[in-house]
Design a protein with these regions (language model features):
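Residue-level marker for buried hydrophobic side chains located in beta-strands
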Residues: 7-9, 49, 78, 150-152, ...
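Metal-dependent catalytic neighborhoods of phosphoester/phosphodiester hydrolases
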Residues: 59-68, 208-209
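Active-site metal-binding loops of divalent metal-dependent hydrolases
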Residues: 11-14, 53, 83-84, 133-135, ...
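Conserved beta-strand hairpin/beta-sheet module of binuclear metal-dependent hydrolase folds
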Residues: 1-33, 37, 140-155
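Glycine/small-residue-rich hydrophobic helix-like segments
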Residues: 119-171, 178
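Metallo-beta-lactamase
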Residues: 26-40, 44-56, 72-130, 135, ...
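Accessory terminal helices/loops
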Residues: 147-148, 157-221
Length: 221
């Protein structure tokens, strides 16, 4: 919340998974309930930012109504990396199961989703930058206010268990770039005391990262 806008970074896994994937991932499907608990109705979301278009990050972009996928947040403008959409269309053997077009194609066709190539300011104080590794075009989302910085680093550092630059995931398409870009991130995030948000950590949603010699640690905020 900026005081003028309600901005949602990522929409999670959604409620459109087929039964096989539901058994695997066991989604709780609580996003809308949680938003209402915070006093925000879906109609009050102004901006939605998808760091990339894997189904677990954009699943609640849309919901099914009368058999068609429509915007979950009808008054929002959605933003996503253009390169992500282009890659998803290729349906490569390596990662085609991660891209489910009902999560984004209806929004592109309706003009509600803007695809952006590269870095951009989304709204004053909130910008996106390409940080490759997990995918080629994945964004990190930066929130800057009163001289301080918070960063939703997405799947470049998905949890606090992945702080060590060499601990990549099997899902990472470019693990050597994960290594290089984590080091590049730490070179600024640690001395400048950025608050880092971890998208997949069930216990630590955000923290400050520290380094001593070659060991990395975190201090929960």
């Amino acid at each position: 919340r900026t005081g003028k806008q309600n901005i949602l970074i990522e929409t999670g896994i959604g409620n459109k998974l087929e039964e096989k994937k539901k058994k695997i991932f066991e989604p709780q499907e609580k996003l809308l309930e949680d938003l209402r608990g915070a006093g925000v109705a879906p109609e009050e979301i102004n901006i939605v930012i998808n760091s990339h278009l894997h189904f677990d990050h954009c699943g609640w972009n849309t919901i099914y109504k009368d058999g068609a996928a429509v915007a979950t947040f009808p008054n929002a403008e959605y933003f996503a990396p253009e390169g992500e959409w282009r890659h998803g269309r290729l349906q490569t053997e390596r990662d085609r199961v991660s891209y489910l077009s009902p999560n984004y194609d209806p929004l592109i066709q309706s003009g509600q989703m803007r695809l952006i190539d590269g870095n951009a300011e989304i709204t004053p104080g909130i910008s996106v930058e390409v940080w490759p590794g997990h995918t080629r075009n994945m964004w990190a989302v930066f929130i800057r206010s009163a001289g301080k910085t918070a960063c939703y680093i997405s799947d470049l550092i998905p949890t606090t268990w992945h702080l060590d630059p060499v601990w990549a995931m099997a899902y990472d398409l470019f693990p050597l770039e994960v290594l290089d870009n984590r080091k590049r991130y730490y070179a600024r995030a640690i001395p400048e005391q950025w608050l880092t948000m971890f998208t997949h950590d069930p216990n630590v949603p955000w923290a400050y990262i520290a380094q001593k010699d070659n060991k990395f640690s975190f201090k929960a905020a």
